[in-house]
Amino acid sequence: MKKLLIASLLFGTTTTVFAAPFVAKDIRVDGVQGDLEQQIRASLPVRAGQRVTDNDVANIVRSLFVSGRFDDVKAHQEGDVLVVSVVAKSIISDVKIKGNSVIPTEALKQNLDANGFKVGDVLIREKLNEFAKSVKEHYASVGRYNATVEPIVNTLPNNRAEILIQINEDDKAKLASLTFKGNESVSSSTLQEQMELQPDSWWKLWGNKFEGAQFEKDLQAIRDYYLNNGYAKAQITKTDVQLNDEKTKVNVTIDVNEGLQYDLRSARIIGNLGGMSAELEPLLSALHLNDTFRRSDIADVENAIKAKLGERGYGNTTVNSVPDFDDANKTLAITFVVDAGRRLTVRQLRFEGNTVSADSTLRQEMRQQEGTWYNSQLVELGKIRLDRTGFFETVENRIDPINGSNDEVDVVYKVKERNTGSINFGIGYGTESGISYQTSIKQDNFLGTGAAVSIAGTKNDYGTSVNLGYTEPYFTKDGVSLGGNIFFENYDNSKSDTSSNYKRTTYGSNVTLGFPVNENNSYYVGLGHTYNKISNFALEYNRNLYIQSMKFKGNGIKTNDFDFSFGWNYNSLNRGYFPTKGVKASLGGRVTIPGSDNKYYKLSADVQGFYPLDRDHRWVVSAKASAGYANGFGNKRLPFYQTYTAGGIGSLRGFAYGSIGPNAIYAEHGNGTFNKISSDVIGGNAITTASAELIVPTPFVSDKSQNTVRTSLFVDAASVWNTKWKSDKNGLESKVLKDLPDYGKSSRIRASTGVGFQWQSPIGPLVFSYAKPIKKYENDDVEQFQFSIGGSF
């Protein structure tokens, strides 16, 4: 009986003490009904008709109370009936969150779920209050000191409850003042320049809101400034953050102890060097001896030592930099104390987070092999190659030790996949060209194999095109790729505002093989076939020169062409998805081969580079240039439908697609005299484009989401010309020539400037651009605003 009483006290219950064991002819459960009542009955250690003891009652009370589903549990005897009485906690039937914008609803719901507040869980009010308190503390950490978080519980019938988290985020507190103390050598203005947070001023639009996390980053920036300018002993000794009574303004005081400014007099490497002393010693040449000490240089050498040893299998190397100060001469010496550790073997390569991409697809990008010495360079190269596929938002790698082994590890790549399938719809509007539409369905990682499958189509007032494409990047184990396209186009250019009049039907196919040379270089070769049927074309001067060279008769053209394509590609981009560093370049060509009706060739060159301006790659300069040249051979001219034009996203924003190039010259009334100058674009056989962009942090977007959006300020330029114009124009009358520009001049450049925005949204890629021409010519078709929208799968 004493044991039963103790159990009752421990569990906060009251239990009637039985005088003696008895046979329970019936068992009654009070306080609940339905499924919960049946669950309690099923959990009882006794059944009706069985003998009940004090120990049985204690077990009943203990097991029900420990389940966490009840606020109170009692058990007692009423005659020959065992009565179990409970007060059940509410079951959560719904969870709602209102008033939040800074913290995403999804993030709050994930935290609620993790803390036991999802639908179907037992409601524990104390824990709910603790959760609300932690959210309020988070708001305070980001400068929203007046934010309120109120958990509201609405009790419903049948022991159910709804939870509402009502949030009022309020505004961030402003940094009212910033004061430095103890800085005798470095001015307060210089220290303030190192910080993102700045005191409030009437002209400041952002940067004046106080945020704890940013304040910590700024303090580290101040430390880095001192350490990289010789103040090796500099410390921030105290920070004082004072709120006003309304919690709307913050006054900050930062105390520093600068110490002396040192020069670096010498450096050496000692310790367990894994037998690589000769390879490590040259790394010290990166240091600037007898010059101002810079902690960043020391960190670079530390990383270089780890990387060099990592290439030989020492994946757990530790490097400690020990300074030896000479205060009298204001110099210091650095000793790099190295422990290479054990040489490691890679047991397995493992992948996490790839729910769509097959492991075998990711393994194709690996350079580190299982069962070989660990090589940090090859492991990092695998990460870079995964990034370049464009299949992933983020790629991280780590090494996991193996239980029971001190020289084996697993290399783990953790990826976050992005939507690689898309259904895109594009639309553009021009002052003269009107509305045009483009649609495409593309899957860059088909069934997780890495293969790309696409169906693309364009529909506008003057035509339709369809292209089916397939690329297998892992056609062979050696990395040879196989790609191909089947295409169909049907255009009535007489309805186009920017192209010379004719009707064209085209279909064909091509196949391409790509061969890797090394990690950054590859080349390709391909074969293709194209059939063209052209009719209803008006008599136009440039077109007539082509027809004469081909000796066509009548008002119809049919050609069958076979071509050989070739090219070289270079890629050192850090990732395929919104790159911030590296270069991508290509040279290519295509030439018709024997058996073709036409005889012509086309050459192209493209290069694009990304150059980060800061360590976090938030500010990036991007430059892009391209050139193309085409011509006929064997006394045949370049087909007029193979000429170049510019305009639109990808070549010259701010101008309508395909609207830039030499114009058509028609024969008026079909009399054979070419004297009607048109605004229709016939194109040229040479083109150059150039673009410079400053990629900037997107305003009002959190740091976490910056990698899904891209904002840039750009300048575009392009020129399209006819290199044979000097001889071509001889067939025109002088009165026509005087009204024509010199189409042979490459200096007839168009240019525009504007702002671009890209967003990899949950529904797919969104691209917007607004550009204003800064150099244009008469009759140019301006299209300032362009955008495309899409949906992903």
Curated annotation (Swiss-Prot):
GO terms for cellular component: Bam protein complex. GO terms for biological process: Gram-negative-bacterium-type cell outer membrane assembly; protein insertion into membrane. Residues 1-19 form the signal peptide. InterPro entries: Bac_surfAg_D15 (IPR000184), BamA/TamA_POTRA (IPR010827), D15-like (IPR039910), OM_assembly_BamA (IPR023707), POTRA (IPR034746). Keywords: Cell outer membrane, Membrane, Repeat, Signal, Transmembrane, Transmembrane beta strand. It is found in: Cell outer membrane. Part of the outer membrane protein assembly complex, which is involved in assembly and insertion of beta-barrel proteins into the outer membrane. This is Outer membrane protein assembly factor BamA. It comes from Haemophilus influenzae. The lineage of its organism: Bacteria, Pseudomonadati, Pseudomonadota, Gammaproteobacteria, Pasteurellales.
